Curated annotation (Swiss-Prot):
Quaternary structure annotation from Swiss-Prot or TrEMBL: Homodimer.
Name under which the protein is recorded: 1-deoxy-D-xylulose 5-phosphate reductoisomerase
Residues annotated for NADPH binding in this entry: 10-13, 36-38, 124, 126, 215
Source species: Escherichia coli O157:H7
Pfam families assigned: DXP_redisom_C (PF08436), DXP_reductoisom (PF02670), DXPR_C (PF13288)
Pathway: Isoprenoid biosynthesis; isopentenyl diphosphate biosynthesis via DXP pathway; isopentenyl diphosphate from 1-deoxy-D-xylulose 5-phosphate: step 1/6
Phylogenetic classification of the source organism: Bacteria, Pseudomonadati, Pseudomonadota, Gammaproteobacteria, Enterobacterales
GO molecular function, one term: NADPH binding
Protein function: Catalyzes the NADPH-dependent rearrangement and reduction of 1-deoxy-D-xylulose-5-phosphate (DXP) to 2-C-methyl-D-erythritol 4-phosphate (MEP).
Similarity annotation: Belongs to the DXR family.
BP GO terms, sorted: isopentenyl diphosphate biosynthetic process, methylerythritol 4-phosphate pathway involved in terpenoid biosynthetic process
Sequence positions that bind 1-deoxy-D-xylulose 5-phosphate: 125, 151-152, 186, 209, 222, 227-228, 231
Length: 398
């Protein structure tokens, strides 16, 4: 029986994680749930899964949760704040920590889990995009086990040999017979839109993803392929891959979630329905397998599987992310922060779709790129980049 803390339990990944627990009550027990401000959903989760602890981001939400749980006779202890979240990630009897708090808020609790030597099911993109070196160093020092939840990185992980799986971020790909990692992406809803029309695309059009059901921010990131750029950065850290060992491919059907190319000419791929419960269940049960609740892939209903190289004129954000990695952690942190501001501005109809990449580049050019030495340095770069990005948005929108 694996004991589990879920950081970000009321979000999409958190709810999917609890669904896997629901399908496998004999394998997993929820010890602690950590969330932001969604008290209603947290009440439902506490009543169903009876965790020992529940943590809310702020005191007001925690007070409300405590009152509602007491009325229902729940014995779950309610806490609040970031330190409590970090404590839940490092609880002595917890085996696994699902790190699914979105954004910079997830950094310190995830790092607490790493330092406590836990098995970390990593769904928080920012951990590696902004703190890649810091996090991988901490993993090595504490002998924690990282298991990637993101569907692409999980597909790569499943397609890699065991010596690499057990030494993520440090194993030598070439020594293990790996030539390259092929990161696949759908290309988003504007894959075939004429380039001249991209400037007129609306937020609603950008959010109509052909295959995956996602939130609005990540849907826009899929349309710009910034999500693939961030995944490229994560993959470089996770798999200790050089630029020449990485390939990015457009795969419109989203059936092959990523591949690994070997020296003998073999290519191993992981296929499946586009459902996050598959990679979540894989990381939770690794090295075993459990029922995820996902329907089997029906090969007879599949159309052709097609692939193409990405066009950087269509996807300048992808190129920006690849170049930012070469500049270092300050650049990847600044790019991630700027992109959050520019995407929010696009969703608020303050800027055009094509302005996202232009403003992201502008922020990178204006930033002082000293390498961060600790998480506080990273948060400082993040805050500065957001401020520059806001000014750039206001300049363009006025």
């Amino acid at each position: 029986m694996k004991q589990l803390t879920i950081l970000g339990s009321t979000g999409s990944i958190g709810c999917s994680t609890l669904d896997v627990v629901r399908h496998n009550p004999e394998h997993f027990r929820v010890v602690a749930l950590v969330a932001g401000k969604n008290v209603t959903r947290m009440v439902e989760q506490c009543l169903e899964f009876s965790p020992r602890y529940a943590v809310m981001d702020d005191e007001a939400s925690a007070k409300l949760l405590k009152t509602m749980l007491q009325q229902q006779g729940s014995r779950t202890e309610v806490l609040s704040g970031q330190q409590a979240a970090c404590d839940m990630a490092a609880l002595e009897d917890v085996d696994q920590v699902m790190a699914a708090i979105v954004g910079a808020a997830g950094l310190l609790p995830t790092l607490a889990a790493i330092r406590a030597g836990k098995t970390i099911l990593l769904a928080n993109k920012e951990s590696l995009v902004t703190c890649g070196r810091l996090f991988m160093d901490a993993v090595k020092q504490s002998k924690a086990q990282l298991l990637p939840v993101d569907s692409e990185h999980n597909a790569i992980f499943q397609s890699l040999p065991q010596p690499i799986q057990h030494n993520l971020g440090y194993a030598d790909l070439e020594q293990n017979g790996v030539v390259s990692i092929l990161l696949t992406g759908s290309g988003g809803p504007f894959r075939e839109t004429p380039l001249r029309d991209l400037a007129t695309m609306t937020p609603d059009q950008a959010c109509r993803h052909p295959n995956w059901s996602m939130g609005r921010k990540i849907s826009v990131d899929s349309a710009t392929m910034m999500n693939k750029g961030l995944e490229y950065i994560e993959a470089r850290w996770l798999f200790n891959a050089s630029a020449s060992q990485m390939e990015v491919l457009i795969h419109p059907q989203s059936v092959i979630h990523s591949m690994v190319r070997y020296q003998d000419g073999s290519v191993l791929a992981q296929l499946g329905e586009p459902d996050m419960r598959t990679p979540i269940a894989h990381t939770m049960a690794w090295p075993n397998r459990v029922n995820s609740g996902v329907k089997p892939l029906d090969f007879c209903k599949l159309s052709a599987l097609t692939f193409a190289a990405p066009d950087y004129d269509r996807y300048p954000c992808l190129k920006l992310a690849m170049e930012a990695f070469e500049q270092g952690q300050a650049a990847t942190t600044a790019l991630n922060a700027a992109n959050e501001i520019t995407v929010a501005a696009f969703l608020a109809q303050q800027i055009r779709f094509t302005d996202i990449a232009a403003l992201n580049l502008s922020v990178l050019e204006k930033m002082d790129m000293r390498e961060p030495q600790c998480v506080d340095d990273v948060l400082s770069v993040d805050a500065s980049a957001r401020e520059v990005a806001r000014k750039e948005v206001m300049r363009l929108a006025s």
